[in-house]
Amino acid sequence: MAAGRLLLYTGLSLALCALGMLAVAICSDHWYETDARKHRDRCKAFNTRRVDPGFIYNNNNNLPLRASRSRLDRWEGKLLRARNRRQLFAMSPADECSRQYNSTNMGLWRKCHRQGFDPEIAALIRKGEIERCTYIKYHYSSATIPRNLTFNITKTIRQDEWHALHLRRMTAGFMGMAVAIILFGWIIGVLGCCWDRGLMQYVAGLLFLMGGTFCIISLCTCVAGINFELSRYPRYLYGLPDDISHGYGWSMFCAWGGLGLTLISGFFCTLAPSVQPVPRTNYPKSRPENGTVC
């Protein structure tokens, strides 16, 4: 009896902690973060380089450090041609610096400039010229598509916008359903604990496991959406330079922690009724005599 009660109380406590962690993750804006300080410093150094006639600027990528094609065998020639093809379609430093990259942090609802990472952006925010945070759209809008592009590229961007929109909707929708199911399971578990009903405790555990499943779907969809945004075409519009560091923030880890606590609480609440002994009644069982029950 004591072991079952301990499992039940532990499961309900972990479920309550999981609800708190998921609520913090949903309300915060640190699911995904970027740091563009190195890129900004490199672009400043590139724009302030010497341009006088007596100075010759030679990029490291153009230094003659490779052998001639006549001395390469067939396999090395293929590798060299593939590398030349990649360099042909890659962005030059001037093209990368022509587009402004900011240090941002993003959540389910907003995308914000990170505080203390860009003094120029911070000054514009203090003046009120730009907003620190912008809300993420969950509806399709053609205003975000550039106008001066070819028809095929515009069609590809439009299709990618719909796909990214579906991924964002799935992430927010499944996360909301997960929190609602876990909250409903916690209420059922508390009522089952007060009324000493093993079936209600078992149902609460199943609801916790179901909520954890929805949470897994939401987090996996969020990761897939971020990877899709980074691999969109054309790369010069949606890709990130190599010197911009990016990764998941503490909100994402808070959501994964809530997922783990939800699954553990579901296991404990499902196991608790089987540990408790079956209540015995003081009334004797009726026995059949001559085809009738006495």
Curated annotation (Swiss-Prot):
It comes from the Eukaryota. The chain crosses the membrane at residues 172-192, 206-226, 252-272. Gene3D superfamilies: 1.20.140.150. The keyword Signal applies. It is a multi-pass membrane protein. One of its GO terms (cellular component) is membrane. Residues 1-23 form the signal peptide. Pfam families: Claudin_2. This is Transmembrane protein 178B.
